[in-house]
């Protein structure tokens, strides 16, 4: 049984076996207490080890913080506050010791900076344990949300030849000897001789491939790792992160916004119900507005404004921004957070951005100046969802590709979707780690993923 199940359901006077790692030990005259945890819950199980147990002294000597243990015994009612039961051990097995002189985790609050240096052990701490349980609940809620609505989970490729965002910040995939790659007569790298016969990269987004799937299955979603070779050493950026990207045929920008709002509300409600102890922990120890923010999202409709209205509100704010505000700029995090935190005090959706700052595939509006794009902005995070109605008109899409100096031949298959049964369609992308960061109040995105990948850091 997992310790969470034992704490919640184990009957008094029943005999059970508990497995886990020692969090604390207290030695008293004639007996000892240990608390063991297995990661299934914030709370540990208290185990009482009587001094009359065979090999008591040898066992207790090994039961230091971090030791792996199995304890079998009788469930009894606990006289202590805050715990329903405890376990009176009849047999204890120590599987692996942890030397207290060298084990880096002890019963004290460690800094997140220190914990990042021992990423292989930090999951054992209360904070990181809570993060991973909330992360798991978020992932479960995402799949459940889409499956309940008939979406197909599309497995899009991690190795790709396309750059969805057009940013060029992609990790190359090659089988060449980097010290001596094969070259053409002109001296350029000869990708025709490489593994895929052409340049290949780690994906920055599964969107374009999801559009392919949506043209056959109507409503699909992707949920997987994406990669960005962006040399940003900040608390908001990762080189490897997970994205959720639904794509819906027969859908416009309004339907896209409706789904995004419903989606976020569903996830927050699910996590509050699935992880109440963990969310209380974050509210108490990390950010005392976490629970209020979650309830705000669940109970209130998101504000919706256009980009033009957002610019007007920013200009009227009399606030001095690092990046000056004028129509045509790409909203920066400081602008997004001012709108969400200070002005509206809740998530809002900004739509209809200037075409010159958005991707080629976004549908051109009738004003010929803006595209049917939308961003969901959240307090403390800024943009948490970005999406758009896609350009379904072949002639307009071809013109946009030409205007942005993109090689149309590389997108022949994407253009084919507009030649054969084109239809209005829309979708969005959610940065999964930013969602978890927003949910938990954690200040650094590196602390909401098990193994963060950042510039000059690829440990494990």
UniProtKB/Swiss-Prot annotation:
- What CDD domains does UniProt report for this protein, alphabetically? AsxRS_core, EcAsnRS_like_N
> Which Pfam families does the entry link to?
tRNA-synt_2, tRNA_anti-codon
Enzyme Commission code(s) on record: 6.1.1.22
Question: What's the main place this protein lives?
Answer: cytoplasm
Is Cytoplasm among the key words of this record? yes
Q: Which organism is it from?
A: Picosynechococcus sp. (strain ATCC 27264 / PCC 7002 / PR-6) (Agmenellum quadruplicatum)
Compartmental location: Cytoplasm
What is the protein name stated in its UniProt record?
Asparagine--tRNA ligase
Is Oxidoreductase tagged as a keyword? Answer: no
Q: What class of enzyme is it?
A: ligase
Q: How does it assemble?
A: Homodimer.
Q: Which GO terms describe its biological process?
A: asparaginyl-tRNA aminoacylation
Describe the family membership recorded for this protein in Swiss-Prot or TrEMBL. Belongs to the class-II aminoacyl-tRNA synthetase family.
Record-level GO cellular component terms? cytoplasm
As its record notes, the protein acts as a catalyst of: tRNA(Asn) + L-asparagine + ATP = L-asparaginyl-tRNA(Asn) + AMP + diphosphate + H(+)
Question: Could you tell me one molecular function GO term of this UniProt entry?
Answer: nucleic acid binding
Q: Which NCBIfam families match?
A: asnS, PRK03932.1
Q: Which UniProt keywords apply?
A: Aminoacyl-tRNA synthetase, ATP-binding, Cytoplasm, Ligase, Nucleotide-binding, Protein biosynthesis
Tell me the domain of life: Bacteria
Q: Where is the signal peptide?
A: none
User: What InterPro entries does its record include?
Assistant: Aa-tRNA-synt_II, aa-tRNA-synth_II, aa-tRNA-synth_II/BPL/LPL, Asn-tRNA-ligase, Asp/Asn-tRNA-synth_IIb, NA-bd_OB-fold, NA-bd_OB_tRNA
Q: Matching Gene3D superfamilies, A to Z?
A: Bira Bifunctional Protein, Domain 2 (3.30.930.10), Nucleic acid-binding proteins (2.40.50.140)
């Amino acid at each position: 049984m997992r310790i969470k199940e034992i704490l919640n359901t184990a009957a008094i006077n029943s005999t059970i076996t508990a497995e886990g790692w020692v969090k604390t030990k207290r030695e008293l005259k004639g007996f000892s207490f240990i608390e063991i945890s297995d990661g299934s819950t914030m709370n540990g199980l208290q185990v009482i080890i009587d001094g009359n147990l065979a090999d008591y002294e040898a066992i207790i000597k090994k039961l230091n913080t971090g030791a792996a243990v199995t304890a079998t015994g009788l469930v009894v009612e606990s006289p202590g506050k805050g715990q329903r039961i405890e376990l009176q051990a009849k047999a204890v097995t120590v599987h692996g010791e942890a030397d207290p002189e060298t084990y880096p985790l002890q019963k004290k609050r460690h800094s997140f900076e220190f914990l990042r240096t021992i990423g292989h052990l930090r999951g054992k701490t209360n904070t990181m344990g809570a993060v991973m349980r909330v992360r798991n609940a978020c992932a479960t809620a995402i799949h459940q949300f889409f499956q309940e609505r008939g979406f197909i989970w599309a497995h899009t490729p991690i190795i790709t030849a396309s750059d969805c965002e057009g940013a060029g910040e992609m990790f190359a995939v090659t089988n060449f000897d980097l010290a001596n790659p094969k070259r053409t007569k002109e001296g350029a790298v000869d990708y025709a001789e490489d593994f895929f016969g052409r340049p290949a990269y780690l994906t920055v987004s599964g969107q374009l491939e999801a559009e392919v799937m949506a043209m056959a299955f109507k409503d699909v979603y992707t949920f997987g790792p994406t990669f960005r070779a962006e040399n940003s050493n900040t608390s908001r950026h990762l080189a490897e992160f997970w994205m959720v990207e639904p794509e819906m045929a027969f859908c416009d920008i309004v339907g896209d916004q409706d789904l995004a709002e419903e989606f976020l509300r569903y996830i927050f409600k699910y996590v509050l119900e699935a992880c109440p102890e963990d969310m209380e922990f974050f509210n108490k120890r990390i950010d005392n507005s976490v629970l209020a923010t979650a309830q705000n999202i669940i109970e209130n409709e998101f504000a919706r404004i256009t980009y033009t209205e957002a610019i007007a509100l920013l200009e009227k704010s009399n606030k001095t921004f690092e990046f000056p505000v004028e129509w045509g700029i790409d909203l920066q995090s400081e602008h997004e957070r001012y709108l969400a935190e200070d002005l509206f005090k809740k998530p809002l959706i900004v739509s209809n951005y200037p075409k010159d700052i958005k991707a080629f595939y976004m549908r051109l509006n009738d004003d010929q100046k803006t595209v049917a794009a939308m961003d969901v902005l959240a307090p403390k995070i800024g943009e948490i969802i970005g999406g758009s109605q896609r350009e379904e008109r072949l002639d307009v899409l071809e013109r946009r590709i030409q205007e942005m100096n993109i090689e149309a031949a590389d997108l022949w298959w994407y253009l084919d979707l507009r030649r054969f049964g084109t239809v209005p369609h829309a979708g969005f992308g959610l940065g999964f780690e930013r969602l978890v960061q927003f949910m938990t109040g954690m200040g650094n995105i590196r602390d909401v993923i098990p193994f963060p990948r950042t510039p000059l850091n690829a440990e494990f």
